[in-house]
Amino acid sequence: MDFSVQQADRETSARLGRLSTAHGEIDTPAFIPVGSLGSVKGVDPADLEQLGFRLVLNNAYHLYLRPGHKVVAEMGGLHRFTGWPGAILTDSGGFQIFSLAKLCKVTDEGVSFQSHLDGSTHFITPETAIEIEEALGADIMMAFDHCVAFPAEREVVRDAVRRTTLWAQRCQASRRRTDQALFGIVQGGLDADLRLTSARDLIGLGFEGYAVGGLSVGESKAEMYAMLDVTVPELPASKPRYLMGVGMPEDLIEGAARGIDLFDCVVPSRHGRTGSLFTSVGRVVIKQARYVRDEQPIDPACGCPVCARYSRAYLHHLFQVKEMLSSRLNTIHNLWYFADLMGQVRSAIAQGRLRSFREEFYRSCVRTSLDASAVDVAEVDLHRHAPDGTSRMLKKEVG
């Protein structure tokens, strides 16, 4: 894997980059669709290619349980097994173990837990996590980390940071393959000092990339962005920076402006299945009765194949009668929206107008968001660290 910064924004910490892997190149900032079980729900690899995606996420925890990492290896690895020709990133599964598994017990040696599927007992160490990820054969692997629940006492978070560093060292030491990149994951909760400690410890281990983990777990938008303001400037500018599990549209813009290169989230597919559709002026909740005779596409400004062919009325009908096609079409539209949004972000960075793009985004979308969190975002000052090291503020006034 190789990463290069093509252009840095003068007004924010955003940058254009290119991530090169054995399975293709990814222009950054980029959004990564999530296919935890080996597929992005509702779509196939050809759909993802046509939508412009070149990198997807699979989850090692889920694939370890079913069908098993050894089965995937016997089938030629994830690329051959899933039919996806692009790049793949595997999450180590640490977050899923702590959030899904039953009777989870953590020690410095590893984590014992019961499967959320059948109650079977398992013990995962950093060494076995790497063994699993190497068997799966993704282009990018994530180190095994300890993500604590939110909120948590400072001593609990401190211990998780210590353990994350210990496990990261063991992950590095246990690597056998040289054709896969390994990213370290910064933890630290909402404690700025612990975030810095975690980042500096991991940088000392020399990973090929660095992720910011443990966010979007219940904290406010302002708190999340404050942790990015602390953490991202500490990370090496020459390495890709990945914000894990964060993917609302405003988060992509705010994260990119702070120097994040990669994002992943289940939002496009999960919201699609529940009938929440992203548009250039906010979200459409397609189950609402107002759409029963609406001949318009989801978004007249959208260029996706769903908006080119189907009306809101038809999509409302499909959702109401629980047709499988509903989830598929909704997900395709949402994925198109996210791919297009990231394309607009990259264009704005290239043209030196990310600040004005951000402001226009809030003017068009913030008042029609389904939740109040976007309003909070618009009122948050965007701290930036310019290339010359100075700090500035980008403030959006909600009109």
Feature locations, PLM:
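Structural signal for hydrophobic packing residues in well-ordered secondary-structure cores
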Residues: 137, 168, 172-175, 206, ...
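Glycine-rich phosphate/ribose-binding loops and adjacent secondary-structure elements
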Residues: 162-165, 174-298
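Glycine- and acidic
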Residues: 150-151, 158, 209-215, 324-327
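Non-catalytic, usually N-terminal nucleic-acid engagement modules in DNA/RNA processing proteins
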Residues: 1-176, 289-292
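C-terminal extensions of enzymes
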Residues: 1-18, 26-30, 42, 145-151, ...
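Conserved, mostly hydrophobic/aromatic
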Residues: 24, 56, 91, 133, ...
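A non-catalytic, amphipathic alpha-helix used as a structural packing/dimerization or gating element
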Residues: 128, 132, 159-170, 197, ...
